[in-house]
From Swiss-Prot:
Its EC number is 2.7.7.-, 2.7.7.108. Keywords: ATP-binding, Magnesium, Manganese, Metal-binding, Nucleotide-binding, Nucleotidyltransferase, Transferase. InterPro entries: SelO. Its cofactor is Mg(2+); Mn(2+). This is Protein nucleotidyltransferase YdiU.
């Protein structure tokens, strides 16, 4: 019996008019083999715990199940602030939709499937290096609790693919609640296809925002929720030190899920001006610019939705973005510092925290984790991370005095142990540092995916101690801090 018999598949996007996509059959790679199979994720859909030959043939595009209808989506987008009408799935195909056992629907998307009408000058392929990075980062983000697409499988091959050098071709099976991007709406707006613009909005609301249907202004209510989800996502990026790198509108999910992992990086040393994409010469997508770019992208989406939503409603939603993001960011940072209440002087304490880390090139994740462990170690473990020890002592003294004013149930002070236990649930011990990904890539390019599997296991539960994997918590070596990541993938 086919493994797909136990899975509920649908083709709702492929049922839309062909103005939305082009049907394309995947072009198989040579000698495809398994690299990674996300067993825990697979079982949520009724798929086998262990991968098999049928799954390999199905998901690599060699023998598609009858309920798969592969299509390349058409969209547009603003890339580095410049509108590009000629975008679309240039190497990825939406195969079908698949429901979990609880009825939650996800797209099945095959990245690296070959040429499509939207490939432009590309070859339609994905390389193992970038596919491995996307697999690991999407699962790391899920482990952190940040809204994201997911990775179901990674397959390698013997097909040569040429970027800066010859690399192995690969396939990534990506799952997402939707692959509809801001750029889908821009495409229909700028080509005056207002009927299709409305149809897409109607379907997105029906599928993903059903609570908006009964409101007096469904489209305005929906856009307000898109603003809210985007603000939350970017607040999470800032709180966890994640730099996306390519925040073009065609890389923005309409659901506020982190989408299209390219030259991303998590901060090592805290640097608000950090630029992870070495092709971003002007720093448009630098770490500290992400909140501003989120609003810019939402404004571009608002313009595309202007045939459906009154100007006043669009402006009201956009006007709420900064406050929403700041509220989410403040909540997240309070949790990371173990401060449940808002008290006088907190603004200065937070500002001085970020300044201390930036001025001393202190590792962001490590500092917060050590701060979360003061119930079982002395203050020196935190102070030792900072070059200016006196500045660190001064800030830490202020912080501990402030933390001591937190009250729990029945008005009693919260103990150091209670505070630190809560902080360890939101301050990860493990993140996907670029040097760790690079080491996994080097093993995988030799056909060894065990290092990647170990790393994926740790990143799935990054708040746990994992004493057997302590090496993955190490700070990067000097070469690891200087890795340059490009958009080539």
């Amino acid at each position: 019996m086919s493994v797909w018999n136990a899975v509920h598949l649908s083709r709702r996007f492929a049922a839309l008019p062909q103005a939305f996509y082009t049907p394309v059959h995947p072009q198989p790679l040579q000698n495809v083999r398994w690299g990674m199979w996300n067993s825990r994720l697979a079982q949520q859909f009724g798929l086998p715990e262990a991968p098999n030959d049928e799954l390999l043939l199905s998901l690599s595009g060699q023998q598609l199940p009858a309920d798969f209808s592969p299509v390349a989506m058409k969209y547009a987008g603003h890339q580095f602030g410049v509108y590009n009408p000629d975008l679309g799935d240039g190497r990825g195909l939406l195969l079908a939709e698949m429901a979990t056992k609880q009825g939650e629907v996800f797209d099945i998307h095959l990245k690296g499937a070959g040429l499509t009408p939207y490939s432009r000058m590309g070859d339609g392929r994905a390389v193992l290096r970038s596919s491995l990075r996307e697999y690991l980062c999407s699962e790391a983000m899920a482990g952190l609790g940040i809204a994201t697409t997911r990775a179901l499988a990674l397959m390698s091959s013997e097909t040569p693919v040429y970027r800066e050098r010859e690399e192995r071709g690969a396939l990534l099976v990506r799952l997402a609640h939707t692959h509809v991007r801001f750029g889908h709406f821009e495409h229909f707006f700028y080509t005056d296809q207002h009927a299709n613009l409305k149809l897409l909005a109607d379907k997105v609301i029906e599928w993903h925002f059903p609570d908006c249907v009964q409101t007096s202004k469904p489209y305005a209510a929906w856009f307000s929720q898109v603003v809210e989800r985007t603000a939350l996502m970017i607040a999470q990026w800032q709180a966890y030190g994640f730099n996306h790198g390519v925040m073009n509108t065609d890389n923005m999910s309409i659901l506020g899920e982190t989408f299209d992992y390219g030259p991303f990086a998590f901060l090592d040393d805290y640097d608000p001006n950090f630029i992870c994409n070495h092709s971003d010469y002007q720093g448009r997508y630098a770490f500290d610019q992400q909140p501003r770019i989120g609003l810019w992208n939402l404004s571009a989406l608002a313009h595309a939705l202007s045939p459906l939503i009154d100007k006043d409603d669009l402006e009201a939603a956009l006007g709420s973005y900064s406050e929403r993001l700041n509220l989410h960011f403040s909540r997240l940072m309070r949790a990371k510092l173990g401060l449940a209440t808002q008290q006088e002087g907190d603004g200065e304490l937070f500002a001085d925290f970020f300044a201390l880390l930036a001025n001393n090139h202190t590792d962001y994740t490590r500092f917060l984790r050590e701060l979360s462990c003061l119930d079982r170690q002395g203050n020196e473990a935190v102070i030792d991370l900072v070059l200016d020890r006196e500045a660190a002592k001064t800030w830490l003294t202020r912080y501990l005095e402030r933390a001591a004013r937190e009250l729990g149930q029945e008005g009693r002070p919260i103990s150091t142990r209670e505070r630190c236990q809560a902080m360890r649930q939101v301050n990860p011990k493990y993140i996907l540092r670029n040097y760790l990904a690079q080491q996994a890539i080097e093993f995988a390019e030799r056909g060894d995916f065990e290092e990647m599997q170990r790393l994926a296991t740790v990143l799935a539960s990054p708040y746990a101690e994992h004493p057997e994997f302590e090496r993955y918590a190490k700070l990067p070596p000097e070469w690891g801090k200087k890795l340059e990541i490009s958009c080539s993938s």
